[in-house]
Amino acid sequence: MTAGAKKLSLGVLLALGFIDLGRGGFHWLAPDSGAGVVAGMNLSFPNARDVVFLLALNGISQIFWGIAYLFIVFRARQLVRLALLMEVVRGSMVLATEYLLKPPVSPVPGRFMHMATTIVCGGVLLLCMLPSGKQHR
């Protein structure tokens, strides 16, 4: 991995760590988990609390992804490529679900973030796979 790719990959994971902490904290702590306020979902139906609950659970998961990414950046840099690969796979699965398998009725507020994160992490992962030039042939 080149020095530039290493810095870029650490920067991307650092940013994703803080984004996931913020986004996850919001979903977990907001009274409606962001369903009504951010996504504009109708929460007047009887099982609306289930939607709020599921978004809060997703927020908890995002918090732990954020912690994991920050741990990798500061303590376990040997896992950077694995973290980027996992983010690309996760993002691809989210996009496949969102656009092909189970499209939602209303637009997902984070849909462009899903695309951008998947593309950026995929590009950085490819850069990380390039040889550093220090290898002997």
What are these regions (language model features)?
Residues 1-23:
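Cytosolic juxtamembrane helix and N-cap/initiation of the first transmembrane helix
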Residues 17-36:
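Transmembrane alpha-helix/helix-exit interface in multi-pass inner-membrane proteins
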Residues 38-42, 104-116:
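Non-cytosolic membrane-interface motifs at loop->transmembrane helix junctions
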Residues 40, 44-70:
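Core segments of alpha-helical transmembrane spans in multipass integral membrane proteins
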Residues 66-82:
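Juxtamembrane helix-break-helix junctions at the cytosolic face
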Residues 82-99:
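Hydrophobic alpha-helical membrane segments
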Residues 119-137:
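Membrane-water interface at the C-terminal end of transmembrane alpha helices
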